[in-house]
């Protein structure tokens, strides 16, 4: 099982997003989710060796944040910060 799937399956929140330490768009995603009263799990790619490559392979999304909606039966790949704003 990929590291991405492990994180998606273990999260017990409304959303999960992959981030990096210095990332204004990740902060924007956090603030957006907070403003909508949604819970989220943040996974910092800087702290998980090889995870960034797995995220790119699974989503083809090369920038952070990489956001998933976990509220349904299956995780939904939302995209990045701009995509999240449109999605909500």
Name these PLM-found stretches.
Residues 69-88:
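Non-catalytic, surface beta->alpha helical segment in thiol-disulfide oxidoreductase systems
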Residues 24, 46, 85:
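Nucleotide phosphate-binding site architecture
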């Amino acid at each position: 099982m990929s590291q991405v799937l492990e994180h998606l399956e273990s999260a017990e929140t409304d959303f999960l997003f992959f981030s990096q330490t210095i990332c204004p768009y990740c902060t924007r995603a956090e603030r957006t989710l907070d403003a909508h009263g949604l819970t989220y799990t943040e996974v910092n790619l800087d702290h998980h060796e090889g995870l960034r490559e797995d995220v790119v392979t699974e989503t083809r999304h090369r920038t952070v944040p990489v956001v998933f909606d976990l509220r349904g039966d299956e995780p939904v790949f939302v995209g990045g910060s701009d995509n999240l704003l449109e999605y909500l």
